[in-house]
Structures are given as structure tokens and as C-alpha cells.
A protein has these predicted regions:
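Rossmann-like NAD(P)H-binding beta-loop-alpha module
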Residues: 59-140, 147
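A structured beta-alpha segment of the ubiquitous adenosine-cofactor-binding alpha/beta core
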Residues: 1-24
């Protein structure tokens, strides 16, 4: 045994990096790869940020990087994308990839509790960190989404073009309203091919409550992958925790040993470059359906003004729900739209917010009809 990482790199056949962070961990991995040593890592933040550099070094030296534990913990999604689904062109991936967020949203719905109350409980139970921002602001999920997208499409996209939005603005009222409309709110990683480009985005999303992903509750994770031959596949399990991580790490070590025994000519690489798609589509150019909620004056003609604004941006309405007024002069209005570009929706919302009869800024949540 040694406490010197460089000594371990020199003497060990396989390097397992579990120290975390993006500085010292990067040094360890690069030094190991330069010496032709295979690496196993669970470091999602490092791979999301420096994956292109690390795998370029691995290709140069003929070494391998295995990283099953970086996405989905004990769910074998990396191996499935790399091997089991290799005969498919991946059309889309939907993922519930953060147990903390999924636990919070599940408890808010089940116990009719607000966000801050459930977050405090999650911290007491060890499901959330003392500083939970990486989880609840969506960046943990975004790291995982970037890795999965890069593997699926053969190009390291990095974090910069990925749209990230967390769950901190989700209210109990919205969870109740969307449930009445037949939806559940999940923090969803969305990866899609789109006319030569790729969508990689993370945000709260309304999904039909009868869908398989809507039934994934508490700290569990799930990934739905659609391939052109296989259709929809679903991977479900524990996405974090020492046992789930250990399971994935040991599986990677086993694959490394198989590669070492097979020899370099028959090894299975950890990443194969394909460059099938050019770039990540900006969020403003993404087409989606939307849920809009707002408070308006209980006066004739208000809805007509709102629908006229939406129509001027070619946004058509799927349904409108007006909640019964309980005292006061305002009513709650919920609008579901058909597909439209996000830039058009944002422009329409600016004009709707400027109406004298609108009492609060419009809140919107994207919808995915899985």
C-alpha cells in the first residue's frame, strides 16, 4: 500500500480513480494514460469537462478509460450504449439521473409538502448534501447527460452548450395542477438527434403520468433509450450510493482485465469517435410543447388578448384551464400549447407579461410526450 498516487501509477497494472474533483484527478488519469495504464473512474464532472482531452490521450497511448459509474451508478447504461446498442442509431435518450431531485419531487407530490421542507428532510436522511446546489440546480444531471450524449453520438460536446435548469422554482401548486392535467414533473435529461444537430438539455419537464418514467420515484434513476432498430429500452435502478457505485466500478475493472487478457488487437475501447452530428442545438431553437401558468384579472377579453399574442408567434393552444376564483379579483389560468420554438415562446411571454391584466410573470415548463 502507498499514499503516493504517482508511485501507484508506476507500479499498478490498473488505475482506479475515485478521488473526485477535476484537478488532481485529471493529473492522475493523464499520467496513467501516458504510461499506457488502463483507467477506471466514476468522475462525471471530470469526463464532462475534459473527456475529449482524456480520450485523445487514451487513443494516443492505446490505453482504456472505463467509466460506468459516472452515469446512473449501478445502472449499466454506459456498457449498454457502448456494446449492447451499438447496432443502433440512437434517436433519443431520456434520463432521470439525480436521486436527490427525484426524491424531492416525489415527496412534494406524495406528502403535499413544499420544496424547502422536503429538501431539509433529504439533507437529514443523507439524500442531499449540506450544499445541494450541484444536484438541485441540475448540474449533476447535466454532467451525466453530456457523457451519455457524447458516447451515443461519438463526439465530446463538453458542458458549455448544454442547457441546464434546476428544480428550485417548482412549487407545490404546480405539482398539484399538472397532476390534475395528467402529468408529473421530473428533472429530465433530454438527448435527441435533430436534423444534423443534437439536443442536450436538462430541466424540469412535464411527462404523462402513465409513462414508464413517471413511475420512477424516490431516489431511483432510470434511462430510456430509443434506437432505430431496437425501439424503446428502459434501464432502472439505484443511481448513487456506495454499493451501486462499487458494482459499476468492479464491472469496469473486470472489463479492463478482459481487455488485458485479450490483447490490444481485440480490446473493446471505452469510446469510439464518430462525429455524426455537428453541434448542440441552442435552447432557443428547440421545439417543444409548453405548460404556462399565470394569474390574470377576472375580466372579459383577457384570454382573447393572450391567445392573440400566442397566435402572432404561430403558437397554437392545446387546452386552457381556468381555475375557479376563490375570493379576490384574480383567477389562475393554465395553458398547454402545441409544438413551437422556444424563442417564439419567450418572445410571446414578454408581451403577455406586459399586459395590464396579467398579475404575475408567466411561468412555463416544457412538456415531453413520451
Amino acid at each position: 500500500l502507498t499514499t503516493d498516487a504517482m508511485e501507484a501509477i508506476e507500479t499498478c497494472q490498473v488505475i482506479v480513480e475515485l478521488v473526485g474533483g477535476t484537478t488532481f484527478a485529471k493529473t492522475i488519469i493523464l499520467e496513467a494514460l501516458k504510461r499506457g495504464k488502463p483507467v477506471v473512474t466514476a468522475n462525471k464532472a471530470l469526463l464532462a469537462k475534459y473527456g475529449e482531452e482524456l480520450f485523445a490521450e487514451a487513443e494516443k497511448s492505446g490505453a482504456d478509460i472505463f467509466y460506468e459509474a459516472s452515469v446512473g451508478g449501478g445502472i449499466p447504461i454506459i456498457k449498454s450504449l457502448r456494446e449492447g446498442l451499438v447496432g443502433n442509431r440512437i434517436n433519443r435518450i431520456y434520463g432521470i439521473l439525480n436521486g436527490t431531485c427525484n426524491y424531492i419531487l416525489t415527496r412534494m407530490e406524495r406528502d403535499q409538502a413544499d420544496f424547502k421542507e422536503v429538501l431539509a428532510d433529504a439533507q437529514k436522511l443523507g439524500y442531499a448534501e449540506a450544499n445541494p446546489s450541484l444536484d438541485i440546480d441540475g448540474f449533476d444531471t447535466a454532467h451525466k447527460a453530456t457523457i451519455a450524449a457524447s458516447l451515443a453520438y461519438g463526439k465530446w460536446f463538453g458542458m458549455d452548450p448544454v442547457y441546464v435548469e434546476g428544480i428550485t422554482e417548482i412549487t407545490l401548486d404546480e405539482i398539484k395542477l399538472t397532476k390534475e392535467l395528467g402529468y408529473k414533473i421530473k428533472l429530465l435529461a433530454i438527448i435527441k438527434q435533430n436534423d444534423g444537430n443534437v439536443e442536450i438539455r436538462v430541466h424540469p419537464t412535464l411527462i404523462p403520468k402513465q409513462s414508464m418514467l413517471a413511475k420512477v420515484d424516490d431516489v431511483f434513476n432510470a434511462v430510456m433509450v430509443n434506437g432505430d432498430f431496437v425501439g424503446d429500452t428502459l434501464f432502472y435502478g439505484r443511481g448513487a450510493g456506495r454499493n451501486a457505485t462499487a458494482s459499476a466500478v468492479v464491472a469496469d475493472i473486470t472489463d479492463v482485465c478482459l481487455n488485458l487478457n485479450a490483447g490490444s488487437s481485440r480490446r473493446l475501447p471505452g469510446f469510439v469517435a464518430g462525429n455524426l452530428y455537428d453541434q448542440v442545438l441552442p435552447i432557443d431553437n428547440v421545439r417543444s410543447r409548453y405548460y404556462l401558468s399565470l394569474q390574470v384579472a377576472d375580466e372579459p377579453g383577457v384570454l382573447a388578448k393572450i391567445t392573440n399574442i400566442l397566435a402572432s408567434y404561430n403558437i397554437s393552444i392545446s387546452s386552457v384551464v381556468q381555475k375557479e376564483r376563490k375570493g379576490g379579483e384574480n383567477v389562475s389560468l393554465v395553458i398547454l400549447t402545441h409544438l413551437c420554438e422556444e424563442k417564439d415562446m419567450k418572445a410571446a411571454i414578454v408581451r403577455i407579461n406586459a399586459l395590464e391584466e396579467v398579475r404575475n410573470n408567466v411561468k412555463f415548463i416544457r412538456i415531453e410526450d413520451l
